[in-house]
């Protein structure tokens, strides 16, 4: 009994519809919590059995997970996950410690609710400590350094850098397109630079952990444009300050690369002759390589540029694999196994006497190099051309590709772990922006995009926690997506900011004067042209569907009550129909010739009216005769017996 009471006292109160879903007064739930605390974990299947069967909100599920976390209970996907987390110790349970399953539907064991499934997967990942964040950040940095170290051994990298140097000098590209401005600024100046004060460069850098977390918690009532631009230098200011130093580094790389390229060409030429570099040249080669790598680490290339270099490296590697595959298939046609071929081929890619050497390995090899000598020669010539293009021997190039792939793989895995460990942060921020035009899952996805960008930008040496820094990127991604996607008719971000400014001012003036301010008062308060205020207020109105139900019965729609300016009113249609019938009867009282002339002259019952000349041609008479017939017919119509039938239409 004491244990049950302690479980109740340690667990937070759950009152209200938005609290955790566990009823702490239920005996089954009490026993469930007691056993979960004793084990230190609970599986998602066990948790689903004690959750209520009715529809639950994502907020309530998140609060329940948070409550269990505060009680020291980890939520894992399955028993195996808990055993692995405890270092392989098997968690034993006997019949007495088995969780009593409640009489809830078994549907919760297998759910198709995407939010619940997402939260279930998210709950299986443990949160990171400050030390864990630093360890992962170091792994990301190490993976990136490994990639750069591999790229620096390829002449293609430096040829691309020389092109960038020339384009920077002529002004065809900007410095921000080549390097990571913030990282290079910090490396050259020896201080942690604040994020650049520009929309696309990133949100503001938090002052400290507590302040950042407090702002994150208070983000619920904020508008889409409430980002602090920070006090860091602008992008233009950074470029102006860094340009001279960056160009000096690029000049140094250019001068060192000239000597390095000569050594690379010498190395490839030696391998083509079956020789190798001398000890002095090898030492100079390694020294220049280390110096250039250090220069590039100081520059901190833009991620897009690194990706372009990696793609270039992989493209050549794909060509190399294709050539080697063709050579392997030729050898296979002569009964040479893959293992035999690779053993004889690796290390001798550029050996000019390779064909003669493999003849000594047997009859199959002799037939292979003699019968397909032209194909073998052509393929090996193309492979040698690739070595000349890359500036390194093929075996070294293959090692470079493996080094870059290893660094990329390690960095990607570390980033994945950092992202998965902070998915709860995205949930906590995204739920503050619900009911703003985007569904909850869409908000989560946009927040995850911001989280991934924060992982790329995070600098652990600055001293603050990752969650504090990532909050700003997540909020920015969510609010930008709301501005871009929430409205049926997209409004630009700068106009969204103007709308928010007017809405805030209108709300403030409502408290001051006790009524909604007029456009004139808003224009005066904001020092903004009246016409612009009117246009913004018009744009700010949300569109409404014509299919919106009207009334309690919902049997009519808004579109039923909107006037169609182009439609003919029923009364007008009736008048027109009656006028047509009356006119026909009145004209029928004339002679057929007079009726025909009037109908043609005034276009009654026809597409258009006709001139006297046209009517005369129809009756084979002169214009004057037609005019006389028309005048006589009109005099007859003026007689009261006929005119009174038409006069009522004239009055109406």
UniProtKB/Swiss-Prot annotation:
Q: Could you describe the subunit structure of this protein?
A: Interacts transiently with the RNA polymerase catalytic core.
Against Pfam families, the record matches this protein to: Sigma70_ner, Sigma70_r1_1, Sigma70_r1_2, Sigma70_r2, Sigma70_r3, Sigma70_r4
Residue spans with biased composition (Acidic residues)?
197-211, 219-229
PROSITE patterns (alphabetical): SIGMA70_1, SIGMA70_2
**Keyword check for Transcription regulation:** yes
Q: Which UniProt keywords apply?
A: Cytoplasm, DNA-binding, Sigma factor, Transcription, Transcription regulation
Where is this protein localized, as stated in its record?
A: Cytoplasm
Matches recorded under CDD domains: Sigma70_r4
List the InterPro entries hit by this protein, alphabetically: RNA_pol_sigma-70_dom, RNA_pol_sigma70, RNA_pol_sigma70_r1_2, RNA_pol_sigma70_r2, RNA_pol_sigma70_r3, RNA_pol_sigma70_r4, RNA_pol_sigma_70_non-ess, RNA_pol_sigma_70_r1_1
Family according to the record: Belongs to the sigma-70 factor family. RpoD/SigA subfamily.
Q: Which residues bind DNA?
A: 612-631
What does it do?
A: Sigma factors are initiation factors that promote the attachment of RNA polymerase to specific initiation sites and are then released. This sigma factor is the primary sigma factor during exponential growth.
Identify this protein by name: RNA polymerase sigma factor RpoD
Q: Name one GO molecular function term.
A: sigma factor activity
Q: Where is this region: Sigma-70 factor domain-2?
A: 418-488
Motif Interaction with polymerase core subunit RpoC is found at 442-445
**Where is region (Sigma-70 factor domain-3) located?**
497-573
A Gene Ontology biological process noted in the UniProt record is: DNA-templated transcription initiation
Q: Indicate where this protein is primarily found.
A: cytoplasm
A single GO CC term for this protein reads: cytoplasm
Region ranges (Disordered):
1-24, 194-236
Task: State the residue spans of region: Sigma-70 factor domain-4.
Answer: 586-639
Q: Name the source organism.
A: Caulobacter vibrioides (strain ATCC 19089 / CIP 103742 / CB 15) (Caulobacter crescentus)
């Amino acid at each position: 009994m004491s244990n049950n009471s302690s479980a109740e006292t340690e667990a937070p109160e759950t009152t209200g519809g938005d609290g955790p879903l566990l009823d702490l007064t239920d005996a089954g739930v009490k026993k469930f919590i007691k056993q979960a605390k004793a084990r230190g974990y609970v599986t998602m299947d066990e948790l689903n059995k004690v959750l209520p069967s009715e529809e639950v909100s994502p907020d309530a599920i998140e609060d329940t997970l948070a409550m269990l976390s505060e009680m020291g209970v980890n939520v894992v996907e399955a028993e195996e996950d808990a055993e692995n987390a405890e270092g392989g110790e098997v968690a034993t349970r006997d019949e007495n410690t088995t969780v009593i399953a409640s009489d809830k539907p078994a549907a919760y064991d297998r759910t198709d609710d995407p939010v619940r499934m997402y939260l279930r997967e998210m709950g299986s990942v443990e949160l990171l400590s400050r030390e864990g964040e630093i360890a992962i950040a170091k792994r990301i940095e190490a993976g990136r350094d490994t990639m750069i170290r591999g790229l620096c051994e390829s002449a293609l990298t430096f040829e691309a850098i020389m092109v960038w140097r020339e384009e920077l000098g002529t002004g065809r590209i900007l410095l921000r397109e080549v390097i990571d401005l913030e990282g290079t600024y910090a490396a050259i100046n020896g201080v942690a630079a604040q994020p650049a004060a520009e929309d696309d460069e990133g949100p503001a850098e938090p002052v400290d952990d507590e302040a950042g977390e407090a702002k994150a918690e208070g983000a619920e009532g904020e508008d889409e444009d409430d980002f602090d631009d920070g006090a860091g230098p602008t992008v233009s200011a950074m470029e102006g300050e860094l340009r001279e130093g960056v160009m000096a580094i690029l000049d140094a790389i250019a001068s060192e690369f000239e000597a390095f390229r000569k050594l690379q060409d010498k190395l490839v030429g030696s391998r083509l002759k079956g020789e190798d570099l001398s000890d002095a040249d090898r030492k100079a080669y390694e020294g220049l390589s280390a110096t250039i790598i250090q220069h590039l680490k100081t520059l901190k290339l833009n991620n897009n540029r690194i990706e372009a270099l990696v793609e270039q490296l992989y493209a050549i590697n794909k060509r190399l694999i294709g050539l080697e595959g063709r050579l392997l298939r030729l050898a296979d046609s002569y009964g040479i196994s893959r293992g035999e071929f690779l053993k004889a081929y690796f290390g001798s890619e550029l050996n000019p006497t390779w064909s003669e050497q493999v003849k000594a390995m047997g009859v199959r090899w002799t037939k292979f190099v003699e019968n397909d000598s032209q194909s073998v020669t052509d393929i090996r010539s193309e492979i040698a051309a690739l070595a000349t293009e890359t500036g390194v021997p093929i075996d070294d190039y293959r090692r470079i590709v493996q080094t870059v792939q290893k660094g990329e793989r390690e960095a990607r895995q570390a980033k994945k772990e950092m992202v998965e460990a902070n998915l709860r942060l995205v949930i906590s921020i995204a739920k503050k922006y619900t009911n703003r035009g985007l569904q909850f899952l869409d908000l989560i996805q946009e927040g995850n995009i911001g989280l991934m960008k924060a992982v790329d930008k995070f600098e652990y040496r600055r001293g603050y926690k990752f969650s504090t820094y990532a909050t700003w990127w997540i909020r920015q991604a969510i609010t930008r997506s709301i501005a871009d996607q929430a409205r049926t008719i997209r409004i630009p971000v700068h106009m969204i900011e103007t709308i928010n400014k007017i809405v805030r001012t209108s709300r403030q003036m409502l408290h001051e004067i006790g009524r909604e301010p007029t456009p004139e008062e808003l224009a005066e308060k904001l020092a903004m042209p009246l016409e612009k205020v009117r246009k913004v207020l018009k744009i700010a109105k949300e569109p409404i569907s014509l299919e919106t139900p009207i009334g309690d019965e919902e049997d009519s729609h808004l579109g039923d009550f909107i006037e169609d300016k182009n439609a003919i009113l029923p009364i007008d249609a009736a008048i027109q129909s009656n006028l047509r019938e009356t006119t026909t009867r009145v004209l029928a009282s004339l002679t057929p010739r007079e009726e025909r002339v009037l109908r043609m002259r005034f276009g009654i019952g026809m597409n258009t009216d006709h001139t006297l000349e046209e009517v005369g041609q129809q009756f084979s008479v002169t214009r004057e005769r037609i005019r006389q017939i028309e005048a006589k017919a009109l005099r007859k119509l003026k007689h009261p017996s006929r005119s009174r039938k038409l006069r009522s239409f004239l009055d109406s």
